[in-house]
Amino acid sequence: MASMQKRLQKELLALQNDPPAGMTLNERSVQNTITEWFIDMEGAQGTVYEGEKFQLLFKFSSRYPFESPQVMFTGENIPVHPHVYSNGHICLSILTEDWSPALSVQSVCLSIISMLSSCKEKRRPPDNSFYVKTCNKNPKKTKWWYHDDTC
């Protein structure tokens, strides 16, 4: 537990001091607990999400960094994207099978920024309706099938 807290403190400091472009840690979210962070995000300039505001929720288990955080979009504005379900779940391989303890909150944020920035057309995943009706509340409990190599 102590190593997890130490790692999260280090990553929290890095995120506060040098956040990825368009991302801001919601400081109030970490006042009571180190294991749940809200990160505010703005769509990058020149993308289909330019100027839109989103919020990410990161939840860390006691096994972090050996286990990936639970990451999902939350709030009223969930991006319409081929790899983002309308309930906020994100189909991104580094959040599951491609996770490595060498990755960090910063690297997850950069991957999400890149995923959104490369989108050319706003649309939901083809199985959105079925998935949202049948999925677990925790996206980490989903057995993801990556339909393409851009997840």
Swiss-Prot record:
CDD domains linked to this entry: UBCc_UBE2W (cd23808)
This protein's record includes keyword ATP-binding: yes
Active site (record annotation): C91
Domain UBC core intervals: 3-151
The protein's annotated pathway: Protein modification; protein ubiquitination
Catalyzed reaction equations: S-ubiquitinyl-[E1 ubiquitin-activating enzyme]-L-cysteine + [E2 ubiquitin-conjugating enzyme]-L-cysteine = [E1 ubiquitin-activating enzyme]-L-cysteine + S-ubiquitinyl-[E2 ubiquitin-conjugating enzyme]-L-cysteine; S-ubiquitinyl-[E1 ubiquitin-activating enzyme]-L-cysteine + [acceptor protein]-N-terminal-amino acid = [E1 ubiquitin-activating enzyme]-L-cysteine + N-terminal-ubiquitinyl-[acceptor protein]
Main location: nucleus
Location of this chain's protein in the cell: Nucleus
EC number: 2.3.2.25, 2.3.2.23
Record keywords, A-Z: ATP-binding, DNA damage, DNA repair, Nucleotide-binding, Nucleus, Transferase, Ubl conjugation pathway
Record field: transmembrane: none
Family per similarity comment: Belongs to the ubiquitin-conjugating enzyme family.
Annotated PANTHER family: UBIQUITIN-CONJUGATING ENZYME E2
Function in brief: Accepts ubiquitin from the E1 complex and catalyzes its covalent attachment to other proteins. Catalyzes monoubiquitination. Involved in degradation of misfolded chaperone substrate and DNA repair.
The protein, known as: Probable ubiquitin-conjugating enzyme E2 W-A
Source organism per UniProt: Danio rerio (Zebrafish)
Gene name tied to this protein: ube2wa
